[in-house]
């Protein structure tokens, strides 16, 4: 009987569900044993979206949602273990990212806040939980994000190839693996699926633009695209990170105010190109050529992938499936890996990526007993 499993839990800025993965780290590379996605109930999703923006009665709403998300995370874990026919005693720990509701690392007293009470997860599953991975890095002067580059370096690094690992969730982030372990870097490029998801939800009441079909039916407005790309964030040097606090529906609608003559489909196409151009511009700053491996929800958007191909002709643009890892589960596996690093007393951040003053063991421990 294998008693060396970890569970990874991820709910990203796109809020499209809770991903739960069961992972073994017995070999050189992590092995995905089972996976499960728990859908966010509509009422819970709506409450989360409201909490991500400034509003009234925030503390009461946060306290309630913290418990509610903890219960949903636990439900995802229990369903995962039932699917895999694995007993909780075989799992060393759960690595829970939580649901980000604020990420503001650049204030004088920078902070990040993820909810999904780890105590509730531990009690409801009977498994020890490691959570709160980002705040140690911020305490050390870092951005607290992105955290996945250390994992990307471990599993995707190659001494013979220049690789960029691109994760496209609500926000997009890149990890540059230049072929040596000294110069790894990573940062958030800007919007991922978040703006285009919000636009189609608002206009067509669809959760996302499947295969980018609606964007494909429109025509990008170059004036609007250049206006969006003029945002100061895109000119910032790394380390940098961003979130829904900056690139959200309210920001998009503010930018759209002078482009009311455009069709809804043209706006969708332009928002998709904002994602693609901001990614491509940063990729070309890192290297003129190489291999780009895409993971996250954006990997399944065929129009997005097509546009990246066109913008990066000297890159091999494929998904992480070519490296043996399903794009949907990469982030979940990364947080199982971070839990394993905590359990073994090993650092989980890359100071060159986040700007932290040193490496550190990330996370806090929440026992089931």
Swiss-Prot record:
It catalyses: 1,6-anhydro-N-acetyl-beta-muramate + ATP + H2O = N-acetyl-D-muramate 6-phosphate + ADP + H(+). One of its GO terms (biological process) is amino sugar metabolic process. One of its GO terms (molecular function) is ATP binding. Its EC number is 2.7.1.170. Keywords: ATP-binding, Carbohydrate metabolism, Kinase, Nucleotide-binding, Transferase. The keyword 4Fe-4S does not apply. InterPro entries: Anhydro_N_Ac-Mur_kinase, ATPase_NBD. The keyword Kinase applies. ATP binds at residues 12-19. Catalyzes the specific phosphorylation of 1,6-anhydro-N-acetylmuramic acid (anhMurNAc) with the simultaneous cleavage of the 1,6-anhydro ring, generating MurNAc-6-P. Is required for the utilization of anhMurNAc either imported from the medium or derived from its own cell wall murein, and thus plays a role in cell wall recycling. PANTHER family: ANHYDRO-N-ACETYLMURAMIC ACID KINASE. NCBIfam families: PRK09585.1-3 (NF007139), PRK09585.3-2 (NF007148). Belongs to the anhydro-N-acetylmuramic acid kinase family. This is Anhydro-N-acetylmuramic acid kinase. The gene is anmK.
């Amino acid at each position: 009987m294998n008693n060396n499993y970890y569970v990874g839990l991820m709910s990203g800025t796109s809020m499209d569900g809770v991903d739960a993965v069961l992972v073994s780290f017995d070999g050189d590379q992590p092995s995905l044993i089972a996976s499960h996605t728990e859908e966010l109930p509509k009422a819970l999703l709506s409450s989360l979206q409201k909490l991500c923006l400034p509003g009234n009665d925030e503390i009461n709403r946060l306290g309630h949602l913290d418990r509610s998300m903890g219960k949903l995370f636990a439900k995802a874990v229990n369903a995962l273990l039932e699917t895999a026919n694995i007993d909780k005693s075989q799992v060393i720990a759960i690595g829970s990212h939580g649901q980000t509701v604020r990420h503001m690392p650049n204030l004088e007293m920078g902070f990040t806040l993820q909810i999904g009470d780890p105590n509730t997860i531990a009690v409801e599953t009977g498994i020890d939980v490691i959570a709160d991975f980002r705040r140690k890095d911020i305490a050390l002067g870092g951005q607290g994000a992105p955290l996945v580059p250390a994992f990307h370096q471990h599993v995707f690094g190659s001494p013979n190839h220049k690789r960029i690992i691109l994760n496209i969730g609500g926000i997009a982030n890149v990890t540059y693996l230049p072929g040596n372990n000294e110069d790894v870097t990573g940062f958030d490029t800007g919007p991922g699926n978040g703006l285009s998801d919000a636009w189609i939800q608002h206009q067509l009441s669809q959760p996302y633009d499947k295969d980018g079909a609606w964007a494909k039916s429109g025509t990008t407005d170059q004036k609007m695209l250049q206006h969006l790309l003029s945002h100061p964030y895109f000119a910032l040097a790394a380390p940098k990170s961003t979130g829904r606090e900056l690139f959200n529906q309210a920001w998009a609608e503010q930018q759209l105010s002078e482009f009311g003559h455009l069709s809804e489909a043209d706006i969708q196409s332009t928002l998709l190109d904002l994602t693609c151009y901001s990614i491509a511009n940063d990729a070309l700053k890192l290297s003129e050529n190489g291999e780009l491996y895409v993971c996250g929800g954006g990997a399944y958007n065929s129009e997005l992938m097509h546009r990246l191909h066109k913008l990066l002709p000297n890159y091999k643009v494929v998904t992480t499936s070519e490296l043996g890892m399903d794009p949907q589960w990469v982030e979940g596996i990364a947080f199982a890996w971070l839990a394993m690093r905590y359990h073994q007393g090993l650092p989980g951040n890359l100071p060159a990526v986040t700007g932290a003053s040193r490496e550190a063991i990330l996370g806090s421990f929440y026992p089931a007993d």
